[in-house]
Amino acid sequence: MSFFFVALLSAVWRWVGKGDTEVFASMVDSLFSMAKLSVEVMILLFGTLTLWLGFLKIAEHAGLVEKIASWLSPLFRRLMPEVPKNHPAAGLITMNFIANGLGLDNAATPIGLKAMRSLQSLNPTPKIASNAQILFLVMNASSLTLLPVSIFMYRAQQGALDPTLVFLPILLATSASTLAGFFSVAFMQRIKLNDPVVITWMLAIASLLSVFILFLSHLSASALGAFSSLLGNAVLFGLIVTFLLIGILKRVPVYESFIEGAKEGFDVSKNLLPYLIAMLCAVGILRASGALDVVLDMIRYLADSFHWDTRFVDALPTALVKPFSGSAARAMLIDTMTTHGVDSFPSFLAATVQGSTETTFYVLAVYFGAVGIQRARHAVACALFADLVGVLASIGVCYWFFG
């Protein structure tokens, strides 16, 4: 409701203050176009969910998910106390984070939805998000991106001298975003981070990431692109083969298990559509009202007042629309590259922001909508805080790297 109210105020201002008589027509057009987009997105998700939930059901029947959960049980007992020991949600959450980090969106979303449904089975208040669900959603919305291949592709298409020049800035900014999301939820939920088990896991993860980043930073642009493509596709296909092989070795009825999981994908898709339409239509109305332009004008005015460098403002359209729409943010990124030049400061910053933040409200609609959550509690605030830190970190890192 707040989106519609803000959009109304912005539209009235554009109509009365600026004489824009087309603003309400634009908002109505956006409303119906976003409703259409919701159905198109749902059709794509339907196929992906059906496929991956089928494979996941094989892994579940073979005991693979339970095995991963048992390995991670000591950590999850501290971060998500309401999740029982060896609960399959722990394994699914881990697989989702790995898929997100490697940029495997086609696998990450179905696995994530399966994890959210698993957490929902433990939720004593089905309409209200539990602490575990909030932590999972915020970490998903601010997920660490290790291989931002799509950003490199956009820069290469625009003729960048070195498409991977923003690789390290993106890694630093996305790390800041992920840490901000985690610590904000930990603060809200009073999670004890000084526990030896938590510290050990955090140090181990940080060490692995450091080694991986060090390895990637020494690759050339062409080698990094080739490695990214090889790793992503190999992991994706490797997961499928692993699920099938373990299923066969454990004498799981593979075909029957796949069909059972695929049917779950149909049920999830059917329940998700109303929530997706509601969120995307609200976002479309807000964008069409011009409210984001008002925010940009205010930021530019404040920067001028304090005599700050204002080059960063030219990249902020990408930052402002990214929480609402991934496609709109991509369009803003490409527009910035075209307008200012692909190797300009605004383009470097826009690319870094695009690679370090997530479509928060889309993630919220998909993950909570799939299980019927109506009250998100502090999930939205923590996710948006992570986005804000990601944007601020992007600005700081880009001034550090590119001056």
Predicted features along the sequence, with ranges:
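Membrane-embedded alpha-helical segments and adjacent helix-loop junctions characteristic
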Residues: E22-S121, K250-T339
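C-terminal transmembrane helix pair
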Residues: A107-A108, A115-R155, A160-R190, L316-G403
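Hydrophobic alpha-helical segments, principally membrane-spanning helices and signal/leader peptides
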Residues: F32, V39, P88-A90, T125-Q133, ...
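Generic signal for short, ordered secondary-structure residues
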Residues: T94, I98, Q133, L224-F227, ...
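Signature of multi-pass transmembrane helix bundles
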Residues: M1-G47, A156-L286, S305-F306, H378-G403
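Hydrophobic alpha-helical context, especially transmembrane and signal-peptide helices
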Residues: S26, S38, H87-A90, T94, ...
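Mixed-charge, polar/low-complexity N-terminal
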Residues: A25-S26, E40, E82-V83, S121, ...
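Short glycine/serine/threonine-biased micro-segments
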Residues: F5, W52, H61, G101, ...
